[in-house]
């Protein structure tokens, strides 16, 4: 039952950002279930697909005002789970464990990240690290409207504007991704409220597809990054590919 509950919660995130729920469900299952990675991967995919099917049945019976484009995002999110399971399986065990711990740490300790670990001045702008919180929210909302992963945008912003260290930028990028998920949910509610046509959705998807790809490549070309940065960059590029599929569908 806990897997189905977690799958339902993660399916909501998958609907909001057109990304499969495995990236969020996997560290949660790893924390509560003493199972091997292959079993956790299978449970993650099964729970997310079950939650997607249940959500689809609810949408077809129309108790909620969900349009066809939202059902498309839900289906892409479910398929993204299958791809995400293979994507994480391609990583080394250390990288996968590092990614899972970073995601779980971000979900459970977001205030601590900003108010203690990042509480020092920023150069060359000489702004206190407290200013990174509204900056992260703004970056997350911009990334939501552009419909691409917030990780590459945050890596560039913290690198070029704040002169932050790579580990610091990667941690902030994972935190901003949560802001992007919330922002995408807000965008979805705005679209439902204003009854925006599909053309407006593509208007936000296509620029995000191009900018997300460019932003994800620049940090890797600019400097050599550590294992954490490589994992975050790979996750952001995977998000961009999923959004490209959503734009072309």
Model-derived segments and spans:
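Juxtamembrane transmembrane-helix boundary motif
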Residues: 1-20, 24-38, 57-146, 153-160, ...
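Hydrophobic alpha-helical transmembrane segments of multi-pass integral membrane proteins
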Residues: 169-187
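A general structural signal for well-ordered alpha-helical packing
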Residues: 154-158, 166, 175, 179
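Transmembrane alpha-helices of multi-pass small-molecule transport proteins
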Residues: 43-58
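Hydrophobic transmembrane alpha-helical segments of multi-pass transport and channel proteins
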Residues: 53, 178-182, 210, 214
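Membrane-interface alpha-helices at helix entry/exit sites of multi-pass transporters
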Residues: 35-44, 67-72, 163-175
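Short hydrophobic/aromatic, small-residue-rich stretches within specific transmembrane helices
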Residues: 44-48, 173-177, 201-206
């Amino acid at each position: 039952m806990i897997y189905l509950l977690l799958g339902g919660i993660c399916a909501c995130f998958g609907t909001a950002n057109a990304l499969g729920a495995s990236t969020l469900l996997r560290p949660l299952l790893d924390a509560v279930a003493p199972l091997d990675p292959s079993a956790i991967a299978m449970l993650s995919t099964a729970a997310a697909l079950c939650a997607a099917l249940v959500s689809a049945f609810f949408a077809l019976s129309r108790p909620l005002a969900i349009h066809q484009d939202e059902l498309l995002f839900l289906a892409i999110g479910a398929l993204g789970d299958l791809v995400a399971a293979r994507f994480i399986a391609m990583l080394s065990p250390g990288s996968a464990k590092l990614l899972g711990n970073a995601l779980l740490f971000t979900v459970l300790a977001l205030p601590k990240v900003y108010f203690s670990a990042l509480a020092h001045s920023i150069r060359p702008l000489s702004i206190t690290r407290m200013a990174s919180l509204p900056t992260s929210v703004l970056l997350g909302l911009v990334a939501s409207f552009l419909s691409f992963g917030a990780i590459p945008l945050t890596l560039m912003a913290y690198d070029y504007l704040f002169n932050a260290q790579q580990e610091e930028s990667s941690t902030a990028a994972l935190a901003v991704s949560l802001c992007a998920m919330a922002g995408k949910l807000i965008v979805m509610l705005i679209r439902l409220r204003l009854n925006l046509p599909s053309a407006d959705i593509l208007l936000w998807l296509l620029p995000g597809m191009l900018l997300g790809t460019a932003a994800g490549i620049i940090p890797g070309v600019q400097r050599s990054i550590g294992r954490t940065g490589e994992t975050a960059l790979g996750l952001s590029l995977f998000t961009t590919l999923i959004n490209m599929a959503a734009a072309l569908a």
